[in-house]
Amino acid sequence: MPIQVLPPQLANQIAAGEVVERPASVVKELVENSLDAGATRVDIDIERGGAKLIRIRDNGCGIKKEELALALARHATSKIASLDDLEAIISLGFRGEALASISSVSRLTLTSRTAEQAEAWQAYAEGRDMDVTVKPAAHPVGTTLEVLDLFYNTPARRKFMRTEKTEFNHIDEIIRRIALARFDVTLNLSHNGKLVRQYRAVAKDGQKERRLGAICGTPFLEQALAIEWQHGDLTLRGWVADPNHTTTALTEIQYCYVNGRMMRDRLINHAIRQACEDKLGADQQPAFVLYLEIDPHQVDVNVHPAKHEVRFHQSRLVHDFIYQGVLSVLQQQTETTLPLEEIAPAPRHVPENRIAAGRNHFAVPAEPTAAREPATPRYSDGASGGNGGRQSAGGWPHAQPGYQKQQGEVYRTLLQTPTTSPAPEPVAPALDGHSQSFGRVLTIVGGDCALLEHAGTIQLLSLPVAERWLRQAQLTPGQSPVCAQPLLIPLRLKVSADEKAALQKAQSLLGELGIEFQSDAQHVTIRAVPLPLRQQNLQILIPELIGYLAQQTTFATVNIAQWIARNVQSEHPQWSMAQAISLLADVERLCPQLVKAPPGGLLQPVDLHSAMNALKHE
């Protein structure tokens, strides 16, 4: 068979195999188009589970007459025009394949009118070449799409359709997911002429829990712990059910959204599961409705034709961010109740050294009274009840920050600290005016060596070795401990009994090195590290450090600092002149003994005399 270009209808039918899996897939694509068009009301009419009719009617901006034919063409879209648009996509659709694919396996009719047009127009495609016919029609501003006889021309696909009830249940689930993503849109779902679901638009933030209860049920609403967690460009909002009261019925509620797009992402599910693992049974699953907001440039949605999956550019950061956000609200729920002194009129719950969900470690409350309220992770329709201070909250309810006054002062001090890093404590007196130095940097050789000129001699200096000595000097405490830098997202690791015992024995020494942690039964939470470790991959470095400590019988700060300095990763895979000059200036200031007596592997003289003699001619 010779190579030939496929007919448009066949090409679209092949694409439909990826996009149009069942009637619910059609509903998803068409409703998302309505939302992208700015619709505030979408009516979905279904007959015979979607096999006979799928009608989507919206009050969006509509489609111009001259663009109707393009709307049914493959790879035609109004949502992106360049690669930059694709890399920063915020609309739900962008591939330009849905309508063409659907029309190739059904009898599709598109009717639309814009506010500028006096009349509406109707388009439909038919035949082998998918020729589009456009004619006048009566229709208000907005768009209606009718999909008749789905898979009528692909009998093999039609055989795989399930019963009418099963297919409609899938459609119902899609509408539930969309309703949770867009509280500002009214969604009406009808089946065989009967209104089955009606989700009214939320006028105020305080009514969101009403729609949440209508979709997820009262049991989930009663056990929901609100989350609002933020760090940099990442924001996590929503609800997670209290694992201590999660039932089998609730475990079916697992809804996750990335920038408003419904997702089934293993990374997100793993982070949530890991945060709840200590409170869930082996056969239990967490229940949650979570919304992740992230810079569109940091996530790739062009992974799956149906757009069910995403790929994060910094997946480890996203995983840890979600894990810490969920873990924080769960820990607030289970903290032991402690009395407050001069903070609240009655004994209230104060989680020691904890933060409110949705706040970073350095967040300062807008009002002083905000810090005086305990965490309020649950809410219900009524006022406080028998569960101890359950309150109804408006909008995105979240736990109020609870911490002690002394901790608040520490956080304010941290906030007022200049962004420039303080100079590390010198381990030896600095050289006066750099009377002794390595010399002048001439160039970089091999990417990690500096060619130096000093007093008429030429030397090669290993920059990674110099950096290791500098780190050891920065990590070794002088007259005072090394300054600890709190982590915005603490690192929680599972440890063995031997590792936990070693950490407890070395805790005071690690504190002098700027490493602060808290431990519980099976885990250790790293809360602060010294400045040289802030940019390191702590997920790898800290477990290796714990393993090293578990193998030691005695501990010394110098040995621990030396081990860390040897095992940290260099921040400079390729060195520049400016970086080399800055490094040598720091080494000369903090490690003058290296200038006087360079250790092995740091400096290597270059014999210029031999080279010059080789060039001399008789």
Curated annotation (Swiss-Prot):
Which PROSITE patterns has this protein been placed in?
Answer: DNA_MISMATCH_REPAIR_1
Query: Which residue stretches does the UniProt record annotate as biased composition, category Gly residues?
Result: 383-392
Q: Which GO terms describe its cellular component?
A: mismatch repair complex
Q: Where is this region: Disordered?
A: 366-403
What SUPFAM superfamilies does the database record attribute to this sequence?
ATPase domain of HSP90 chaperone/DNA topoisomerase II/histidine kinase, DNA mismatch repair protein MutL, Ribosomal protein S5 domain 2-like
Looking up CDD domains in the UniProt record yields: HATPase_MutL-MLH-PMS-like (cd16926), MutL_Trans_MutL (cd03482)
Classification via HAMAP family: DNA_mis_repair (MF_00149)
Q: Which family does it belong to?
A: Belongs to the DNA mismatch repair MutL/HexB family.
Annotated protein name in UniProt? DNA mismatch repair protein MutL
Origin species, per record, is Salmonella typhi
Organism lineage string: Bacteria, Pseudomonadati, Pseudomonadota, Gammaproteobacteria, Enterobacterales
- In the UniProt record, what gene is named as encoding this protein? mutL
